[in-house]
């Protein structure tokens, strides 16, 4: 696949078939995605691949616990989960944003039907969070994980698969850690 074409054809895909995705395909995507750059080239990520029906349902339920209030904010014309605890007013395109989020709501309600979910963790000891002392929310730490995640999205496109990134599960990390028996020191 040509790079610029891949960059333009890797949207957030929120409608899926129930066609199975083979282990070989998952391995190929992850094996190539792991070459993503990371701070200090530490590559402290770990991926939990979820194909079990019960686990997918539990992950989807946890996702909806965060999605539902986020969507409610949008219906009220605000952007939820702002770093200062407020919901900032949407400045442009409120109706457009809400209409797009309605499609995302369909995904949130049916997430458990997706053939494969991947939960991406990072070993916190590998991160150099250079903006942690600034008077704003940190954005640097995720930089060592999102390169991998984007490579996964591109790999899925290369394999003819749809994909979508969501970060809402991070707020449910404790429950996810219990579900996946995640060791201490990792962030979702």
Q: Predicted segments — roles?
A:
Residues 29-34, 118-127, 131-179:
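Small-aliphatic-rich amphipathic alpha-helix that forms the alpha element of a beta-alpha
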Residues 176-188:
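Short terminal or interdomain "cap/linker" segment that borders an active site or interface and mediates
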Residues 1-31, 42-43, 186-188:
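Specificity-determining recognition surfaces
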Residues 113-116, 161, 184-187:
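Short coil/turn connectors at secondary-structure junctions
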Residues 49-142:
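Glycine/small-residue-rich phosphate/adenosyl-binding loop
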Residues 41-44, 112-114:
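Short, basic and Ser/Thr-rich N-terminal targeting/leader segments
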Residues 15-16, 46, 162-166:
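Short catalytic-loop micro-motif centered on adjacent basic/acidic residues
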Residues 35-41:
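Glycine-rich phosphate/pyrophosphate-binding beta-alpha loops
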């Amino acid at each position: 696949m040509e790079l610029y074409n891949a960059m333009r054809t890797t949207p957030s895909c929120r409608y899926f078939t129930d066609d199975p995705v083979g282990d070989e395909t998952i391995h190929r995507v992850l094996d190539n995605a792991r070459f993503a750059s990371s701070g200090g080239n530490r590559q402290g990520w770990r991926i939990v691949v979820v194909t079990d029906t019960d686990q997918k349902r539990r992950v989807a339920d946890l996702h909806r616990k965060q999605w539902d209030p986020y969507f409610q904010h949008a219906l009220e014309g605000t952007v939820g989960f702002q770093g200062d605890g407020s919901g900032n007013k949407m400045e442009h395109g409120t109706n457009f944003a809400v209409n797009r989020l309605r499609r995302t709501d369909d995904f949130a309600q049916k997430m458990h039907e997706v053939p494969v979910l991947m939960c991406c963790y990072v070993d916190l000891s590998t991160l150099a969070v250079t903006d942690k002392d600034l008077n704003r929310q940190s954005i640097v730490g995720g930089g060592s994980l999102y390169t991998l995640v984007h490579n996964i999205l591109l790999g899925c496109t290369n394999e003819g698969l749809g994909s979508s990134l969501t970060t809402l599960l991070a707020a449910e990390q404790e429950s996810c850690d219990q579900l996946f028996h995640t060791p201490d020191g990792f962030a979702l």
